[in-house]
Amino acid sequence: MDTSVNVDTSSRPAHEPATAPGRFVVRDACHEDLPEAAAVQAVCVREIGQGVIPNDVLTEVTGPGIVHTTIEQWNHFMDDGAIFKILVDRLDMRTVRVAMARVSTSSDAPTPWEIATLHVLPEARNCGASDNLLDACIGNRSAYVWVFADNARAISFYQRHGFHVDASDGAVDDSLGGVELQRLIREDIIESQ
C-alpha cells in the first residue's frame, strides 16, 4: 500500500476555475480512497500548522509513518460506521477534500456526533464545495468539532453552518506540541429534516 504524502497541489488550468459548475463531486469514500484522503489531510495539516505547530512536531505528524497510521485508524473507523466523504476534482479525478464524522467516544461530548476531520486542498477552497461536503457528511445532525484556536477561516466556516464557539476554555493538544484548540458546537438541529 502506498502511504506517501505527495499530493500535487499545482494550480489548475485557467479555463477551468475552481468555481466552475460541476467541477467537483462529493461521494462516499471507500477503503481504497483512504490513502489519498489521508495524504490530503497531511498536506492541509502541514499548511495550517506552519507557525503554530513546532517544526519538528509538524514534520513528524505529517510524515509517511503518521499517514500510514491514519489510514489504519480510518479503516477501523469506517468499519465501525464512521461517515467518510471525499470531494473529487473531475478534471483529474483527484481527491481534494476529505471529511469524516463519527459517533463520539468522548465522555464529555456535547453532541453524539463529532466531525473528526474536514480538510481541503488550497486549490479547492472558496468555491462552495466545502459547504456541500459538510452537508453530505453530517446533514442536519447536531455535531461538534475541534479546530486550532487561531484558525479564523475554520471558525468562520463552521459558524456559517450554525456552529457556535463553545464557552469552555478549549483544550491543548500536546501531541501537536501544545497547540490550543477551540471546540465549536451545532446543537438543536431537527434530525429529520
Pin down the residues of each PLM region.
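Acetyl-CoA-dependent GNAT
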Residues: 6, 12-13, 24, 28-34, ...
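Terminal substrate-recognition subdomain of acyl/acetyltransferases
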Residues: 2-19, 179-193
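Conserved active-site alpha-helix within GNAT-family acetyltransferase domains
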Residues: 131-132, 150-178
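Alpha-helical interaction/dimerization surfaces of two-component signaling modules
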Residues: 40-44, 140, 157, 161
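Conserved GNAT acetyl-CoA-binding A-motif
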Residues: 139-150
